[in-house]
A protein has these predicted regions:
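An N-terminal alpha-helical hairpin/helix-loop-helix interaction module that forms a charged
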Residues: 1-58, 74-169
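Cytochrome P450 catalytic-core helices
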Residues: 65-69
């Protein structure tokens, strides 16, 4: 993305402005962002045909796009993974599993989990315990629901550092 920003700063800014426009549907914004990135990669390849960076972009990677949304709107979005969504829905006993990427459904599930978790007194306090110091975002964030989803779906997420363990664990 930094190479794209260096190459076409206004185009990249427009891509992010569109992605962060909450007046439009999130699935449409994410799909348009994929289109913007495809175009940027096409331009980059034309200008730098022998660059190793030509193979770095991973197509319609909603995972990375969701991370941009999470950083911009932490109370509304969480890092997306189709694998995590399917595993989470299985663990929750949901029968209608997605057959393809469905970040909109994932965000809805995260918001629902977060609301349920907020009703449990000890969970929020325990979460705040691990966010010591000024380097951690202190506002409302779906990352609590994301951590829960990681915890109940796959221990590999914690091992790779994508889910931060609670103190004393």
């Amino acid at each position: 993305m930094l190479l794209f920003l260096e190459m076409e700063p206004e185009y990249v800014k427009q891509a992010f402005r569109d992605l962060f426009n909450e007046e439009k549907s999130v699935d449409g914004r994410m799909d348009r962002f994929v289109f913007y990135c495809d175009e940027l990669l096409r331009m980059y390849r034309e200008r730098h045909p022998h660059s190793i960076e030509n193979n770095h972009y991973h197509g319609n990677d909603y995972d990375m796009i969701s991370l941009y949304l999470t950083f911009r709107y932490p109370a509304d979005y969480a890092p997306y993974s189709l694998e995590r969504l399917i595993s989470l829905l299985r663990k929750l006993g949901v029968g209608n599993l997605p057959q393809a990427n469905d970040p909109v459904r994932y965000f809805k599930v995260m918001r629902t989990l977060f609301k349920l978790m907020q009703k449990e007194d000890g969970i929020q306090a325990r979460h705040q315990e691990r966010l010591t110091g000024s380097s951690y975002y202190q506002g409302e964030s779906l990352l609590l629901a994301h951590d829960f989803a990681c915890f109940i779906t796959d221990d590999r997420y914690a091992e790779r550092g994508l889910c931060r363990p609670y103190p004393g664990k």
